[in-house]
Amino acid sequence: MKKIFQLSFTVFIIFISLVLGVVGNVQQKRSNRCIDFPVNPKTGLCVLKDCESVCKKTSKGLEGICWKFNAKGKDPKQCKCCGLWPPLY
């Protein structure tokens, strides 16, 4: 009885290790990165609400960030969508 339990436990541990390894590989393939998106062509500035809206339309898990401010810390010139993206093949 003890050997059957020991064998079953060993097989269970090996199975769990393999499953965790596969899940880890899948999650690792998604990478956190930012991609630039165009800003309002009329003003040439990034509006946070518009930037967030574009990013949400692109993919659910992305966050919009206005970037590249002038020397006074105002007038952002770039919209970036950051988050987990699927792998590039």
Curated annotation (Swiss-Prot):
Its main location: secreted. It comes from the Eukaryota. Disulfide bonds join 34-82, 46-66, 51-79, 55-81. It holds the Pfam family SLR1-BP. It is found in: Secreted. The keyword Signal applies. GO terms for cellular component: extracellular region. Keywords: Antimicrobial, Disulfide bond, Fungicide, Plant defense, Secreted, Signal. GO terms for biological process: defense response to fungus; killing of cells of another organism. The keyword Signal applies. Expressed in flower buds, but not in stems, roots or rosette leaves. Residues 1-24 form the signal peptide. Belongs to the DEFL family. This is Defensin-like protein 147. It comes from Arabidopsis thaliana (Mouse-ear cress).
